[in-house]
Amino acid sequence: MTANDREVSALFLDFSRRKLLGQYWPRLRKCVESLTVEQVWSRPNAASNSVGNLLLHLDGNVRQWLVTSFNRQEDRRDRPSEFDAPELLPVSVLLDRLDRTMREASDVLARLTEADLLAPYEIQGYPVRGLDAVYQVVEHFGLHYGQISYITKTLSGKDLGFYSELSKTGRREEQVAVRVP
């Protein structure tokens, strides 16, 4: 590895942590905390997921693709159960569970090296590199965060205020650092 390879790897991992843990997760949490348990578990139709199911699904995905894989642990994910939750788990239980997984994911991302990003893994039966796994989690989390934001806006009829710092031109009035827990 060259110094440039290490720098690119460090930039990729830093950006991934900031996006996942400093932006998507806090905003998703804000959305969910604004909903009632009934809203979290409501589905507009049988083909759609509830926010509760999406939270269980994100927990399973982040745990499988980051925590379990990079720690070389046995994968015990039961993906179908994420969409068939039989009971209305309280919002606090859902958020605590995902928060625990996100803290573990943060620890994993903080210690990864360029060698880890290039190393081979098998996830969901697919041969991938560590880089693939990190990218998949950030992209996948962003997709479902967007769905949850949309559902929250639809149910509440309110602007979530995530971009209130932007001017009319879409630019920040001042630079704001995104903190990673």
Which residue stretches match the model-derived regions?
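Active-site rim elements
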Residues: A10-R18, L88-L95
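Short, contiguous alpha-helical
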Residues: T2, E7, R17-V32, E38-S81, ...
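Acidic/histidine-rich alpha-helical segments that form the ligand environment
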Residues: P86-E122, R129-L143, Q147
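Residue-level signal for pocket-adjacent positions within structured domains
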Residues: L35, D78, L112, D116
